[in-house]
Amino acid sequence: MAKTLSKPASGALAPWLGISLIVILFDQLSKIAILKTFAYGAQHALTSFFNLVLVYNRGAAFGFLSTASGWQRWAFTALGVGATLVICFLLKRHGHQRLFSLSLALILGGALGNVIDRLVYGHVIDFLDFHLGGWHFPAFNLADSAITIGAVLLIYDELRRVRGAR
């Protein structure tokens, strides 16, 4: 009887892609609801520090490059697709590392949520507006939230891993 020397996969991709899909679903449904409810620039105060508002972001985080001539749409789309490929590779390779994989799944879902916006609308739909007094944090969306939470978890996981190695 011959033995196979194939190496088993170190992590299952499906559960992590499932989490990413849930992020994309909630992100896109929330944006559809805002687009159907609000006119561009309209805002609805929910608390003294939080509004729902419809704004378009043609750039990246905090409106970076939002006034560029249009090339940024395709550059940020390509960046999102490239990140998707790298993240899928990492998830396949490290799927057994739960916190690491969860953080990547959140980042992946958020990145693809914003890529979908860029491909469908030509810009990202932002609608969560936190403010205090006259100061407003730049509006963002659920995809951005997932990316941020994923990044924080990724840093936490790395710090935990490094401390454990000491």
From Swiss-Prot:
The active site is at D126, D144. GO terms for molecular function: aspartic-type endopeptidase activity. It is a multi-pass membrane protein. The chain crosses the membrane at residues 9-29, 45-65, 71-91, 100-120, 135-155. It is an enzyme of class 3 (hydrolase). Its EC number is 3.4.23.36. Pfam families: Peptidase_A8. One of its GO terms (biological process) is proteolysis. PROSITE patterns: SPASE_II (PS00855). One of its GO terms (cellular component) is plasma membrane. InterPro entries: Peptidase_A8 (IPR001872). It is found in: Cell inner membrane. The keyword Zinc does not apply. Pathway: Protein modification; lipoprotein biosynthesis (signal peptide cleavage). PANTHER family: LIPOPROTEIN SIGNAL PEPTIDASE (PTHR33695:SF1). This is Lipoprotein signal peptidase. It comes from Burkholderia multivorans (strain ATCC 17616 / 249).
